[in-house]
Amino acid sequence: MPELQFKGKEFVYNHHLTVPFRPLEIQPDKGIGDARLDGNLIVHGDNLHALKALLPMYAGKVDCIFIDPPYNTGNEGWAYNDNVNSPMIREWLDANPIGLEDGLRHDKWACMMWPRLKLLHELLAETGSF
């Protein structure tokens, strides 16, 4: 089976396991109808933490996942950066400063996406589509 390869993968390979769990908090004043966590949801927050928070209720239950991650946004203030808490990943990112013309920028983008893709995969049903 083909495998995605990128520089820095060894630093982020298991990062999804170390993301701190933060339970979802219902905000009844922000919704319509009964406040519940078992239907359609809008989750406000860092997507990495939001994905981790969805696991207890939705692991293996999501039929379809569609993502539209930022890529080549042209935004000079952000070029595939990630606000990570892992010292190993932070050390790697600090040692490899991110620049728009950086030859490693796609590797850095893959490092940012990898833990999110791993968590998304955990949410996906056996018969689900990505």
Where are the regions that the model predicts?
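DnaQ-like (DEDDh/DEDDy) 3′-5′ exonuclease domain used for proofreading
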Residues: 1-66, 71-117, 127
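Helix-to-beta-strand junctions that scaffold the AdoMet/dcAdoMet cofactor pocket
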Residues: 123-125
